[in-house]
From Swiss-Prot:
Protein name: Alpha-2B adrenergic receptor
Subcellular location: Cell membrane
Bilayer topology: Multi-pass membrane protein
SUPFAM superfamilies: Family A G protein-coupled receptor-like
A Pfam family hit: 7tm_1
Keyword Membrane: yes
Site (Implicated in catechol agonist binding) location in chain: S181, S185
Keywords from the UniProt entry: Cell membrane, Disulfide bond, G-protein coupled receptor, Lipoprotein, Membrane, Palmitate, Receptor, Transducer, Transmembrane, Transmembrane helix
Length: 453
């Protein structure tokens, strides 16, 4: 088609057309850039190379296709007020629109099921969670989306006469298809995701309560409260003797040589117990100055900081004695290691690195899994908020077309809010996930740092 041959009143003023075109052009560019960044981050970052993150690559690809094949033609149709392009392309364009939208929400549904299986059948499912298996699931997702989106291309239904005037490209108005596609593309996957995430929450809550119960049980089974003695070392801790190699270092730095500690254990919570107090600021990070004592660190301080502490749990310095806290910290010899827990407990030993390293690694993995599950819950929530108004009003028009039809302007607004969702996932990853933040920073800053600009 070459355009209209009759007088046509533009739907928007020149100023409104320029503003809308600028905003949607920015949306297109931002969507392509952000989702391309997500794909690069997953494919190049070691911390994001888990097989399940292939779901995010496929989801980002669907959003890029929306930005390149759907939104530009929707913008032209909106600003011109008629369909400028070929009639055959209108049918393909509508089918692709449904395909990409359905693919996005079925991806989210598959991701939520993947998280549920990983939580409920951790050992069994994680051994089967291979890249090949994830790719097969992704292929199934696209096939489901194709089955839902292709019927209008195959079955034309009752051919209505072409309206006189300018050509239009409108959504399918067959009531059966509206209801079937809305249920298959949105409402059924939404219901599945809500039920699955409720189940994940119940499992996580139960696991948390079980962990607290085990912690209380182990606390009751321990020896009685340590009694301070003259030397300041509790006498009730029945652990193997660990001799601190720091006394000679303390003497060399001008500190009086402290009495040899015969027994080491958990830091007592009794404020009167003076051996290794919880407020011991013995583990500063280089380049960051002194931080809070280990007793001030709790699980409520946030997962980001927790993981950084976990990954950097190899200490650099340790004072020679409790009295030397106010003095500059001493360099710890390489022969001993320190294990600092979130409750402020400090354990010294020469061979704790291997066993504790596995524990810290497991803790880091669980922390990352928990954060990632939260991020995906936010992604799903934002998707539902963006697309629910459109699918609700679209279905309402099929159920009672005479009395429940939504005004055209409001329906178009809901339509464009749904498109905006394609640009939001990279923002969500950046705000809520530090692994993506690090990967984005590395991708964006590396060319500048290498060229010296």
């Amino acid at each position: 088609m070459s355009g209209p041959t009759m007088d046509h009143q533009e739907p928007y003023s020149v100023q409104a057309t320029a503003a809308i075109a600028s905003a949607i052009t920015f949306l297109i560019l931002f969507t392509i850039f952000g989702n391309a960044l997500v794909i690069l981050a997953v494919l190049t970052s070691r911390s994001l190379r888990a097989p399940q993150n292939l779901f995010l690559v496929s989801l980002a690809a669907a959003d890029i296709l929306v930005a390149t094949l759907i939104i530009p033609f929707s913008l032209a149709n909106e600003l011109l007020g008629y369909w400028y392009f070929w009639r055959a392309w209108c049918e393909v364009y509508l089918a692709l629109d449904v395909l990409f939208c359905t693919s996005s929400i079925v991806h989210l549904c598959a991701i939520s099921l993947d998280r549920y299986w990983a939580v409920s059948r951790a050992l069994e499912y994680n051994s089967k969670r291979t890249p090949r298996r994830i790719k097969c699931i992704i292929l199934t997702v696209w096939l489901i989306a194709a089955v839902i989106s292709l019927p209008p291309l195959i079955y034309k239904g009752d051919q209505r006469p072409e309206p006189r005037g300018l050509p239009q490209c409108e959504l399918n108005q067959e009531a059966w298809y509206i209801l079937a596609s809305s249920i298959g593309s949105f409402f059924a996957p939404c219901l599945i995701m809500i039920l699955v995430y409720l189940r994940i929450y119940v499992i996580a809550k139960r696991s948390h309560c079980r962990g607290l119960g085990a912690k209380r049980g182990s606390g009751e089974g321990e020896s009685k409260k340590p009694q301070p003695v003259a030397g300041g070392v509790p006498t009730s801790a029945k652990v193997p003797t660990l001799v601190s190699p720091l006394s000679s270092v303390g003497e060399a730095n001008g500190h009086p040589k402290p009495p040899r500690e015969k027994e080491e254990g958990e830091t007592p919570e009794d404020p009167e117990a003076r051996a290794l107090p919880p407020t011991w600021s013995a583990l500063p990070r280089s380049g960051q100055g002194q931080k809070k004592g280990t007793s001030g660190a709790t699980a409520e301080e946030g997962d980001e900081e927790d993981e950084e502490e976990v990954e950097e749990c190899e200490p650099q310095t340790l004072p020679a004695s409790p009295a030397s806290v106010c003095n500059p910290p001493l360099q710890q010899p390489q022969t001993s290691r320190v294990l600092a827990t979130l409750r402020g407990q400090v354990l010294l030993g020469k061979n704790v690195g291997v066993a504790s390293g596995q524990w810290w690694r497991r803790r880091t993995q669980l922390s990352r899994e928990k954060r990632f599950t939260f991020v995906l819950a936010v992604v799903i929530g934002v998707f539902v908020v963006c697309w629910f108004p459109f699918f609700f009003s679209y279905s309402l028009g099929a159920i009672c077309p005479q009395h429940c039809k939504v005004p055209h302007g409001l329906f178009q607004f809901f339509f464009w809010i749904g498109y905006c969702n394609s640009s939001l996932n990279p923002v969500i990853y950046t705000v809520f996930n530090q692994d993506f933040r690090r990967a984005f920073r590395r991708i964006l800053c590396r060319p500048w740092t290498q060229t010296g600009w």
